[in-house]
């Protein structure tokens, strides 16, 4: 996390040396998702190690009494990743005019199909065995519904269309 920045700065006494070692992934390009915390509170928690507060404000380019975690990470990183092209564009629009930030590029979160794809589903799909494919999907759905029941006590029928949303909704 962010204390790593100050630990590295304490060690090397150079923002440039910290930048050589730090890459940041920005996950939330909406204002509400980026923590801004009182410097005094962080100092009382020894967040900055042995650095005096005046030096922290100077190296982070912080004006006022609040530290923006994301902006600090962007200023101390050699590069930042947005987790998609859209995310990169929104993050660049959001932070791009700030002084001293690193470039923000896009990366795509990798998916390992061999790990995440069921062997039998893949086999039945590739051999066009639709009946076996449907049967296997129902077996896997029942496994999932059993897990849901074990964790929540809620029972669902595998023969009923069940729609779930497992991703947070973003503003961009």
Predicted ranges, named:
Residues 1-172:
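Catalytic cores of carbohydrate-active enzymes across secretory and cytosolic contexts
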């Amino acid at each position: 996390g962010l204390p790593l920045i100050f630990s590295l700065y304490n060690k090397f006494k150079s923002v440039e040396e910290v930048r050589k070692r730090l890459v940041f992934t920005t996950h939330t390009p909406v204002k509400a998702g980026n923590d801004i915390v009182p410097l005094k509170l962080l100092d009382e928690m020894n967040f900055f190690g042995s650095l005096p507060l005046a030096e922290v404000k100077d190296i982070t380019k912080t004006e006022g009494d609040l530290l923006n975690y994301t902006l600090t990470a962007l200023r101390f990183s050699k590069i930042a990743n947005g987790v998609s092209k859209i995310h990169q564009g929104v993050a660049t629009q959001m932070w791009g005019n700030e002084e001293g930030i690193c470039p923000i590029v896009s990366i795509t979160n990798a998916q390992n199909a061999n790990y995440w794809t069921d062997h039998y589903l893949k086999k039945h799909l590739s051999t066009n065995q639709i009946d076996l494919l449907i049967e296997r999907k129902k077996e896997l759905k029942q496994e999932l519904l059993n897990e849901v029941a074990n964790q929540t006590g809620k029972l669902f029928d595998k023969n009923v269309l069940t729609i779930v949303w497992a991703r947070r909704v973003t503003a961009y």
